[in-house]
Amino acid sequence: MLETRCKYYKDEAMFHGFIPHIMGTRFDILLIHSDAERLNGLWTHIINELERLDKILNRFDPHSEVFGINKHALQSYIQISKELEKILQLCQYYYENTFHLFDITLKDFSKIQIHDHQRISFMSPDISLDFGGFAKGY
């Protein structure tokens, strides 16, 4: 179970939500609104979304989609979710438009092949995906 903390500061109409460890980092959010109940509901939605994305993009979680890709994409084509395919295409766009400075691999994005029908493969044994710099802003 994910450890979370939150507190509503009535005098400031401010809500602070905190998750000490998700996606390899801590997560803090400040929300401003006078309706504490509404903010609590929004916080629950945010937690659920962060947990969902963590199950896709966390390269250290053996149950995540990216962990499986990093483990098997060199041996064969790996089927990926539609969302991960869109994320990879977006990351490829950033890679190409930043003169290769933005790179979600630990080596060289050009060694990833994104195939039709939501499939991916790696062309080199030293490639792995790391969304640490991307996932937090996604």
Where are these regions (language model features)?
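A contiguous, well-ordered beta/alpha segment that forms the leading edge of an enzyme domain
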Residues: 1-132
